[in-house]
Amino acid sequence: MKDKNIILPVQPYLLLDAENYHEILTGRMGISNFYEFHVQDGVPGTFMAVPDGSTALVFGIGERDVKVFIGGTVLRLKEWKFEEGRYYFGVRFLPGKSILPDGLSIQDVVNTDLEIDRNEYGQHLTDSLAEAAGIRERAEILCHYLEGNRKSRIKDTLSKLEEYMRKRIYATSGSITIQMLSRETGYSECYIRRVFRQIHGISPKEFERFIRFQALLNRIGENAGKGGSQEAALSCGYYDQSHMMKDFRMFAGTTPEKYRKLISRKAEQINCDEREVDSYGIGEN
């Protein structure tokens, strides 16, 4: 069952700039969304990535091979480069829910993208994805492989503590203090920082900043063309307008008002098939 407090991570510049972009929003199995787009030959495949606290697994399907990449959250606005002449299919995990290959820690992928062996997530996975008919079939195939990996994981004390902290951060729009989390859990501030960083690769304070920013992106996106970004910012955990503007410029590279106009123009052009909510239960038994 989907947690109503979960904020699905948004990468707006893919939606705005990528060719033939399509995504399926889900929130199931620790997955935020599946997405696809093309980078044609001779076309620069560079987009801007924003902080989202999540991890993305991307398959670049070419005529001769399939390349696999995994990347964690960026720490501020950063270029995200893709090889031209490939179709890309990706899955974005919810924060704290990423499934990493053996031998790779979350710290290894924060603020970077790593190319990994094509068989890291299972034999024949990339071949099956390359031969699939479309994004929904690819999502079903990938879920099958990921589910086998996830079932082997046991929820221990550390993951339960992290889950509690993450849910409290969501519920308070990123405004709960580390001191309050320490009092609520009974663990020291130093210990809960260490546990959180072990699972997310970033500190609770950084994660809270990203959650406030992502909540604001979602609010602006839901109200594209209607204004009210300042009011939305206050409801997303920011102390004041100055606080909001500083983070937004650092993370989005623009102002909330200019971003709202970009989203508004896209909303006027967007094909309803570009973005859909998973109503078919991808990955559910």
What annotation goes with each model-predicted range?
Residues 207-210, 242:
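Conserved structured core elements
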Residues 1-163, 169-171, 177-179, 185-189, ...:
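Alpha-helical bundle regulatory/interaction domains
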Residues 198-202, 247-259:
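A secondary-structure capping/hinge motif
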Residues 176, 193-198, 205-208:
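Long, low-complexity intrinsically disordered regions
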